Regions:
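Bacterial N-terminal signal peptides that target proteins for export
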Residues: 1-8
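Residue-level hotspots at or immediately adjacent to binding/recognition sites across diverse folds
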Residues: 40, 53-317
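Bacterial Sec-dependent N-terminal signal peptides
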Residues: 10, 15-62
Length: 317
C-alpha cells in the first residue's frame, strides 16, 4: 500500500458481492463504525462489515476496494488491496462511511455530505442530503441505502442514492454504525444505544442493550449481528437484534471496526489489536501476536472481499 497522509479508516470491497448473491444472509453490515479520537470514521464492506447488504442485483468487480478519509480523500485499489491510487473527490469534507449496492458506492461524512459513484469508484458526484448533521455510517439492503449520524439522525434513499429523506428516529443520541441482515437494519451508538428497523428503514424502535459503552460498529454474518465499541466491548444477537448478549473480548482497548467473511468475524482496535471469532461471535481470540509492527498502528477499520481482509488506520497505514 502506498504511504498516505490521511487517516484512511473506511474500506469497501465489491468483489464479495459474488458470494452475497449466493448467500444473502452473509452479506455485510459500515460500514460503519466510528473511531474514538478525532475522527468519526469507520469501516464497512459490501458483504460483511459495519453495514450489510443483500445485493442480489449487484454486479461485482473482483479485487476492487475503496477507502475514504478526512478532507474528502478517496483512494481505490483494483488489485485486492496490494496497491492504491488517489481518486478525485467532489468534497473537502471529512468522509466517515462507505458502502456498496446496486452497482453504486455511497460515501457519507461531515455536514451531511453524501457522495456516490456508479463506475466502481473511478469518479464521484455529490448527492442531495436532507441533513446538515454529520453522517457517520451507511449501509445497503433490500435496494435501500440507510445512513446514520449525529443526534440520532437516520436518512434513507430508495433511488440508488440519488436523493435522500429523513426517517423518524427513536433516539437523540449519536449513532455511529449501521448494518443489514435478514431484512433488518441495526444501528448502534453512544451509551450502548441500539435501534432497529424491519420495514426497510421507514420506522425504527429501540432495542435493549447489554452495555452502556459507546458502540462504534456493527456487522452481520451467519444469522448473527455483532457490535463492537469502547473498552473492548463486543455484543451479539442471534434473533435479528431483538435481544443482545455480551461476548468474550480479548482486549480492553476501544474497538473501531468489525467485519465478516469466510465464516469468521474479525475486529480491529487501538494499539494494533486484531482479533477474530470462529464460533459465530461467541468468543474472540487475539491474532496480533507475531505480526510485525502492529502495535505501532492505530487500526480504525477492516473490510473483507475476494477472500481478502484489509485493515486500515491512522497515517495511511
Amino acid at each position: 500500500m502506498k504511504s498516505l497522509t490521511s487517516w484512511f479508516v473506511l474500506i469497501v470491497s465489491i468483489a464479495v458481492i459474488v458470494s452475497s448473491c449466493a448467500k444473502s444472509d452473509e452479506s455485510t453490515s459500515s460500514s460503519t463504525s466510528s473511531s474514538d479520537d478525532t475522527s468519526d470514521n469507520s469501516t464497512t464492506t459490501s458483504d460483511n462489515s459495519t453495514n450489510t447488504s443483500d445485493n442480489s442485483s449487484s454486479q461485482s468487480v473482483p479485487g476492487v476496494f475503496v477507502a475514504l478519509a478526512e478532507s474528502g480523500n478517496i483512494v481505490r485499489s483494483t488489485d485486492n488491496g496490494s496497491s492504491w491510487d488517489n481518486v478525485t473527490s467532489p468534497t473537502a469534507n471529512d468522509l466517515n462511511g462507505v458502502t456498496f449496492g446496486n452497482n453504486t458506492f455511497v460515501g457519507v461524512g461531515a455536514s451531511g455530505n453524501i457522495i456516490r459513484s456508479t463506475n466502481n469508484g473511478s469518479s464521484w458526484d455529490n448527492a442531495t442530503s436532507p441533513t446538515g448533521n454529520v453522517i457517520r455510517g451507511v449501509t445497503f439492503g433490500n435496494n435501500i441505502f440507510v445512513g446514520v449520524g449525529a443526534s440520532g439522525n437516520i436518512i434513507r434513499s430508495t433511488n440508488n442514492g440519488s436523493s435522500w429523506d429523513n426517517a423518524t428516529s427513536p433516539t437523540a443520541t449519536n449513532l455511529y454504525g449501521v448494518g443489514f441482515g435478514n431484512n433488518t437494519f441495526i444501528a448502534t451508538g453512544d451509551q450502548g444505544n441500539i435501534v432497529k428497523s424491519t420495514d426497510n428503514g421507514s420506522s425504527w424502535d429501540n432495542a435493549t442493550s447489554p452495555t452502556g459503552n459507546n458502540l462504534k460498529a456493527v456487522t452481520f454474518g451467519n444469522n448473527t449481528f455483532v457490535g463492537v465499541g469502547a473498552s473492548g466491548n463486543i455484543i451479539r444477537s442471534t434473533n435479528n437484534g431483538s435481544s443482545w448478549d455480551n461476548a468474550t473480548s480479548p482486549t480492553g482497548n476501544n474497538i473501531r471496526g468489525v467485519t465478516f467473511g469466510n465464516n469468521i468475524f474479525v475486529g480491529v482496535a487501538a494499539s494494533g489489536n486484531i482479533f477474530r471469532s470462529t464460533d459465530n461471535g461467541s468468543s474472540f481470540d487475539n491474532v496480533t501476536s507475531g505480526l510485525p509492527g502492529t502495535s505501532d498502528y492505530n487500526i480504525l477499520g477492516v473490510g473483507f472481499g475476494n477472500n481478502t481482509f484489509n485493515a486500515v488506520g491512522k497515517g495511511g497505514n
